[in-house]
């Protein structure tokens, strides 16, 4: 049996048993071969309860709608950085050049920050004072008035209107008084303040703003249930539109006044509304007579009806005269003559001398155009008598001129010559060169016609020139032919 020799033992440490972990640099090197003598240790994943797989959740990264620079701008505008009341504004927002964009559009940062010059202005302090007093409506309207663009009040002269600072203080006080008095139910005082504001803006020719204050007064008067106050405001509002030639709006307001007055049995207000309606109807018909004569006739008929209702002879005569003129311009001479005759009758019955003279001339003109010569002569003689009684030289001039033309049309040249002589004398008394020249020409033609047929005791001008030398010499020496 062989003997066993002594066994050799070697002590091995834990460090020697652990294989070296290759570094990332060495493993990433190109051409590096793994060491076959080393065993790679693979990390073991922790087990998940109920599942053998590891579920990983990734958080979605959303892009911000605004940049950090724009976010800073929002912070600046929200907290009022750079808008200190005292001292110079700080430069916190000086680095922000661009505005920030929102869903509503782009906003410039500079427009959000209030400038120091604006905070030192009168309009800024007035708006703040109105808001501090609790007058929110005053603040809103005053802000609009003080920050609006200059208003063009004259298109031809390009005149612009802006409320001066000293007047803006007064406007603010009136607006605040309107709001406070309305809360106290002092409705008449409110309307008086609105009237003052409307008068001021109308004097500056800012008619839109003046109309706005009239409208406010009317709405407050209607809320008050004070019918007399409501009627007064409507009449003032209508008169404003009448002054500025917005006649249809004026008519609408005056008609409301009339119907309400009739419902309340307020005779005095109804009569006042009637007179204003008549005047407005006549003015509007004068504007429409060339462009829309049928509509003008409808307004004149309404004016005629109202004038007869209130028994106003002057307005009735004017309505009839205007109707006659429109029908004459339309070529309806029969109806024109009918209305002019009614015009003459109303004027004579009411002893309206001026209108009676004018009516006589109008009737005669229509009769002459319709070849009613005898009737025209009669009407003209009536007009001449009225003018002579009233010592109206201009009326005498017109009557004698038309009378001479009427006599010429009828073939009575002797009476025509007499009328033209009277016409020339009246023209010289008027000291009007144009009328004098016109009368001289008419008289010259009349004298020529007369001498052509009646010169030399009825022989005529042509036989005298051809045969009677003695008569020619007498004419040349004495001026008598």
Swiss-Prot record:
Keywords recorded for this protein, A-Z: Cell projection, Cilium, Cytoplasm, Cytoskeleton, Flagellum, Repeat, TPR repeat
GO cellular component, one term: motile cilium
Gene3D superfamilies in the cross-refs: Tetratricopeptide repeat domain (1.25.40.10)
PROSITE patterns, per database record: TPR
Source organism per UniProt: Trypanosoma brucei brucei (strain 927/4 GUTat10.1)
Residue ranges of the TM segments: none
Domain free text: The TPR repeats are required for axonemal localization and flagellar beating.
Disordered, as annotated region: 1-53
Biological process annotations from GO: cilium movement; cilium-dependent cell motility
Keyword Repeat: yes
InterPro entries: Bac_ResReg_Asp_Phosphatase, TPR-like_helical_dom_sf, TPR_rpt
Quaternary structure (record): Interacts with TAX-1.
TPR repeats: 191-224, 231-264, 271-310, 317-350, 357-390, 397-430
Gene it is expressed from: TTC29
Main location as per UniProt: cytoplasm
Comp. bias intervals (Low complexity): 1-18
Role of this protein: Axonemal protein which is implicated in axonemal and/or peri-axonemal structure assembly and regulates flagellum assembly and beating.
Annotated protein name in UniProt: Tetratricopeptide repeat protein 29
């Amino acid at each position: 049996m062989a003997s066993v020799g002594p066994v050799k033992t070697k002590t091995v440490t834990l460090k020697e048993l652990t294989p070296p972990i290759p570094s990332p640099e060495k493993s990433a090197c190109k051409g590096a071969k793994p060491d076959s003598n080393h065993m790679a240790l693979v990390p073991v994943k922790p087990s998940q309860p109920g599942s053998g797989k590891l579920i990983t959740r990734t958080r979605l990264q959303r892009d911000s709608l605004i940049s950090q620079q724009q976010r800073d701008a929002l912070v600046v505008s929200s907290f009022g950085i750079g808008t200190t009341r005292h001292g110079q504004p700080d430069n916190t927002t000086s680095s922000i050049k661009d505005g920030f964009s929102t869903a509503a559009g782009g906003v410039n940062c500079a427009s959000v920050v209030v400038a120091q010059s604006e905070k030192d202005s009168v309009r800024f302090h007035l708006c703040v004072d109105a808001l501090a007093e609790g007058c929110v409506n005053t603040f809103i309207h005053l802000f609009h008035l003080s920050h609006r663009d200059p208003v063009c009040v004259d298109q031809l002269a390009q005149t612009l209107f802006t409320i001066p600072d000293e007047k803006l203080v007064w406007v603010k006080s009136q607006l605040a008084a309107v709001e406070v008095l309305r809360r106290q139910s002092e409705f008449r005082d409110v309307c008086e303040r609105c009237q003052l504001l409307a008068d001021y803006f109308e004097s500056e020719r800012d008619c839109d703003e003046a109309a706005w204050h009239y409208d406010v007064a009317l709405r407050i008067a209607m809320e008050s249930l004070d019918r007399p106050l409501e009627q007064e405001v409507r009449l003032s509002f209508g008169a404003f539109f009448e002054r500025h030639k917005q006649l249809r709006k004026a008519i609408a307001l005056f008609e409301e006044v009339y119907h309400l007055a009739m419902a309340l049995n307020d005779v005095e207000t109804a009569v006042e509304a009637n007179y204003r309606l008549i005047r407005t109807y006549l003015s509007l018909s004068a504007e429409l007579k060339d462009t829309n004569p049928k509509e003008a006739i409808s307004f004149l008929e309404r004016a005629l009806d109202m004038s007869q209702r209130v028994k106003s002879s002057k307005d009735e005569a004017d309505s009839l005269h205007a109707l006659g003129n429109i029908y004459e311009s339309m070529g309806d001479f029969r109806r024109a003559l009918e209305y002019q005759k009614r015009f003459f009758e109303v004027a004579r019955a009411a002893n309206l001398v001026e209108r009676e003279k004018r009516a006589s001339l109008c009737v005669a003109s229509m009769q002459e155009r319709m070849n009613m010569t005898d009737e025209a002569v009669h009407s003209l003689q009536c007009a001449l008598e009225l003018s002579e009684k009233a010592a109206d030289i201009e009326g005498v001039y017109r009557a004698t001129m038309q009378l001479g033309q009427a006599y010429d049309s009828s073939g009575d040249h002797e009476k025509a010559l007499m009328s033209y002589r009277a016409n020339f004398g009246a023209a010289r008394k008027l000291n009007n060169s144009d009328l004098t020249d016109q009368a001289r020409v008419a008289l010259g033609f009349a004298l020529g016609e007369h001498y052509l047929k009646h010169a030399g005791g009825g022989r005529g001008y042509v036989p005298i020139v051809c045969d009677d030398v003695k008569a020619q010499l007498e004419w040349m020496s004495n001026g008598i032919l």
